Amino acid sequence: MGRFLNSIIPYASYEETCTDDYFVDKSLLIDELIPALSKKNRFLCITRPRRFGKSVMANMIGAFFGNVKDSRNIFQNLAISKSPNFSKHLNRHKIIYIDFSRFPRNCTSYEQYINRIQDGINQDLSLAYPDLTIEIGDAVSVSYTHLT
Protein backbone atom coordinates (compact mmCIF):
# COMPACT_ATOMS: atom_id res chain seq x y z
CA MET A 1 0.00 0.00 0.00
CA GLY A 2 1.54 3.27 -1.09
CA ARG A 3 0.89 6.95 -0.90
CA PHE A 4 -0.43 7.02 -4.50
CA LEU A 5 -0.41 3.43 -5.81
CA ASN A 6 -3.05 1.31 -4.08
CA SER A 7 -3.76 3.97 -1.47
CA ILE A 8 -6.27 3.18 1.29
CA ILE A 9 -7.66 6.74 1.10
CA PRO A 10 -10.43 6.11 -1.48
CA TYR A 11 -11.73 3.13 0.49
CA ALA A 12 -11.69 4.91 3.85
CA SER A 13 -13.24 8.08 2.43
CA TYR A 14 -16.01 6.31 0.54
CA GLU A 15 -16.80 4.03 3.47
CA GLU A 16 -17.36 7.16 5.56
CA THR A 17 -19.46 8.80 2.82
CA CYS A 18 -21.77 5.77 2.60
CA THR A 19 -22.76 6.14 6.24
CA ASP A 20 -23.85 9.75 5.78
CA ASP A 21 -27.56 10.48 6.31
CA TYR A 22 -27.78 12.18 2.92
CA PHE A 23 -25.92 9.54 0.91
CA VAL A 24 -27.17 9.07 -2.67
CA ASP A 25 -26.18 5.87 -4.48
CA LYS A 26 -24.51 6.76 -7.77
CA SER A 27 -22.63 3.48 -8.06
CA LEU A 28 -24.07 2.66 -11.50
CA LEU A 29 -21.53 5.16 -12.86
CA ILE A 30 -19.02 2.35 -12.31
CA ASP A 31 -20.88 0.20 -14.85
CA GLU A 32 -20.50 3.03 -17.37
CA LEU A 33 -16.73 3.13 -16.80
CA ILE A 34 -16.05 -0.61 -17.06
CA PRO A 35 -16.10 -0.75 -20.90
CA ALA A 36 -13.29 1.83 -20.93
CA LEU A 37 -10.98 -0.57 -19.05
CA SER A 38 -10.41 -2.65 -22.16
CA LYS A 39 -9.72 0.32 -24.44
CA LYS A 40 -6.28 1.59 -25.40
CA ASN A 41 -7.19 5.05 -24.08
CA ARG A 42 -8.52 3.73 -20.77
CA PHE A 43 -7.42 6.68 -18.68
CA LEU A 44 -10.26 8.84 -17.44
CA CYS A 45 -10.57 12.42 -16.34
CA ILE A 46 -13.78 13.37 -14.59
CA THR A 47 -14.41 17.10 -14.60
CA ARG A 48 -17.28 19.03 -13.03
CA PRO A 49 -17.67 22.45 -11.42
CA ARG A 50 -16.83 22.93 -7.76
CA ARG A 51 -19.03 21.13 -5.23
CA PHE A 52 -20.43 18.63 -7.78
CA GLY A 53 -19.08 15.51 -6.07
CA LYS A 54 -15.87 14.83 -8.00
CA SER A 55 -14.04 13.67 -4.88
CA VAL A 56 -16.90 11.39 -3.85
CA MET A 57 -16.96 9.88 -7.35
CA ALA A 58 -13.17 9.42 -7.38
CA ASN A 59 -13.30 7.76 -3.96
CA MET A 60 -16.14 5.49 -5.08
CA ILE A 61 -14.21 4.44 -8.19
CA GLY A 62 -11.03 3.85 -6.19
CA ALA A 63 -12.83 1.91 -3.45
CA PHE A 64 -14.58 -0.30 -6.01
CA PHE A 65 -11.70 -1.11 -8.37
CA GLY A 66 -8.78 -0.88 -5.92
CA ASN A 67 -7.40 -4.07 -4.44
CA VAL A 68 -6.11 -2.69 -1.15
CA LYS A 69 -9.09 -3.77 0.94
CA ASP A 70 -12.17 -5.90 0.29
CA SER A 71 -14.94 -3.36 -0.28
CA ARG A 72 -17.78 -5.84 -0.75
CA ASN A 73 -19.25 -4.62 2.56
CA ILE A 74 -19.58 -1.12 1.08
CA PHE A 75 -20.98 -2.05 -2.33
CA GLN A 76 -23.10 -5.17 -1.64
CA ASN A 77 -26.22 -3.09 -0.97
CA LEU A 78 -25.67 -0.52 -3.72
CA ALA A 79 -27.05 -0.60 -7.26
CA ILE A 80 -23.73 -1.75 -8.78
CA SER A 81 -24.01 -5.05 -6.87
CA LYS A 82 -26.74 -6.16 -9.28
CA SER A 83 -24.50 -5.67 -12.31
CA PRO A 84 -22.93 -8.72 -13.99
CA ASN A 85 -19.67 -6.77 -13.79
CA PHE A 86 -19.77 -6.55 -9.99
CA SER A 87 -17.74 -9.62 -8.99
CA LYS A 88 -15.65 -9.49 -12.14
CA HIS A 89 -14.18 -6.07 -11.28
CA LEU A 90 -14.67 -5.54 -7.54
CA ASN A 91 -11.20 -5.08 -5.99
CA ARG A 92 -9.44 -6.49 -9.08
CA HIS A 93 -7.36 -3.52 -10.20
CA LYS A 94 -4.41 -1.45 -9.12
CA ILE A 95 -5.22 2.22 -8.87
CA ILE A 96 -3.26 5.44 -8.65
CA TYR A 97 -5.07 7.95 -6.47
CA ILE A 98 -4.04 11.61 -6.48
CA ASP A 99 -5.87 14.24 -4.44
CA PHE A 100 -5.22 17.58 -6.12
CA SER A 101 -7.26 19.48 -3.54
CA ARG A 102 -4.48 19.39 -0.94
CA PHE A 103 -1.34 21.36 -1.72
CA PRO A 104 1.42 20.25 0.71
CA ARG A 105 2.93 22.96 2.90
CA ASN A 106 6.48 22.22 1.79
CA CYS A 107 5.69 22.77 -1.92
CA THR A 108 6.24 26.33 -3.05
CA SER A 109 5.44 25.95 -6.75
CA TYR A 110 3.22 23.97 -9.07
CA GLU A 111 6.29 22.39 -10.69
CA GLN A 112 7.58 21.24 -7.31
CA TYR A 113 4.14 19.81 -6.51
CA ILE A 114 3.96 17.82 -9.77
CA ASN A 115 7.53 16.56 -9.26
CA ARG A 116 6.60 15.44 -5.75
CA ILE A 117 3.64 13.48 -7.12
CA GLN A 118 5.73 11.88 -9.90
CA ASP A 119 8.49 10.93 -7.45
CA GLY A 120 5.91 9.49 -5.04
CA ILE A 121 4.28 7.39 -7.75
CA ASN A 122 7.68 6.13 -8.89
CA GLN A 123 8.60 5.22 -5.30
CA ASP A 124 5.34 3.31 -4.96
CA LEU A 125 5.96 1.53 -8.28
CA SER A 126 9.51 0.63 -7.20
CA LEU A 127 8.19 -0.95 -4.02
CA ALA A 128 5.36 -2.79 -5.80
CA TYR A 129 7.57 -3.99 -8.67
CA PRO A 130 11.09 -4.45 -7.25
CA ASP A 131 12.30 -6.33 -10.35
CA LEU A 132 11.76 -3.28 -12.58
CA THR A 133 14.30 -0.53 -13.02
CA ILE A 134 12.43 2.64 -12.11
CA GLU A 135 14.36 5.79 -11.40
CA ILE A 136 12.73 8.16 -8.94
CA GLY A 137 13.38 11.14 -11.24
CA ASP A 138 11.78 9.46 -14.28
CA ALA A 139 8.51 10.74 -15.63
CA VAL A 140 5.62 8.49 -14.65
CA SER A 141 5.02 7.78 -18.35
CA VAL A 142 8.54 6.30 -18.59
CA SER A 143 7.88 4.13 -15.53
CA TYR A 144 4.55 3.02 -16.99
CA THR A 145 6.20 1.81 -20.20
CA HIS A 146 8.46 -0.42 -18.07
CA LEU A 147 5.32 -2.07 -16.66
CA THR A 148 3.59 -2.76 -19.98
Where are these regions (language model features)?
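Conserved lysine of the Walker
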Residues: 54
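Conserved small/polar residues in nucleotide/adenosyl-binding loops
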Residues: 145-148
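Hydrophobic anchor at the beta1->P-loop junction of P-loop NTPases
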Residues: 46
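Phosphate-binding P-loop
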Residues: 34-41
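P-loop NTPase motor core
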Residues: 75-126
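The conserved Walker
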Residues: 50
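Post-Walker A helix-loop "phosphate-sensing" segment adjacent to the P-loop in P-loop NTPases
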Residues: 64-73
